[in-house]
Regions:
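Transmembrane alpha-helical segments that form the membrane-embedded catalytic/substrate-channel core
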Residues: 21-37, 104-107
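Hydrophobic residues within alpha-helical transmembrane segments
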Residues: 19-22, 97, 101, 120, ...
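Short, small-residue-biased leader/transition segments that mark boundaries at the very start
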Residues: 1-4
Length: 137
């Protein structure tokens, strides 16, 4: 059946899960390496170092933390959408790519300190997660 064929291959939506898993590390890398102070000594306790940051570097780390919070929900939505089989693969792929785009925009908004816009982008991303469930019902 088409459902089993779809489960047996790495769809674009599945690749988006992989991207979502690694995307939060962009925040950590930005916070650590695009400013002064991070080196071998700071690497002994990187969480302590990150807790001392301020401004855009602190926001970059906060974006990372939010990425870790939302990724499990996105991964679950993609997996369940594939298993349910109620939606065309192209639609699942489009929703998953849109979610990744929303996460990149979220990171940019967080880094720039655009709180209200960041919140709207966050809601859009959560809506895309919900949409993955709804279209597959």
């Amino acid at each position: 059946s088409d459902v089993y064929k779809r489960q047996a291959s790495m769809t674009l939506a599945y690749w988006c899960v992989l991207i979502a898993i690694f995307l939060p590390y962009l925040g950590t890398a930005t916070a650590k390496f695009l400013g002064p102070g991070y080196g071998p000594r700071a690497n002994q306790d990187p969480r302590a170092f990150l807790s001392t940051l301020e401004g855009w570097r602190k926001r970059a780390n906060n974006a990372q933390l939010n990425g870790f919070e939302v990724t499990p929900a996105f991964a679950a939505a993609v997996i369940i959408a594939h298993q349910a089989g109620g939606a065309e693969q192209g639609l699942l792929d489009q929703l998953a790519v849109a979610f990744i785009v929303s996460r990149v925009l979220y990171f940019i908004c967080y880094l720039a300190g655009w709180g209200p816009v960041r919140s709207l982008v966050w809601f859009a991303g959560m809506g895309l997660i919900a949409a993955l469930f709804v279209v597959s019902a």
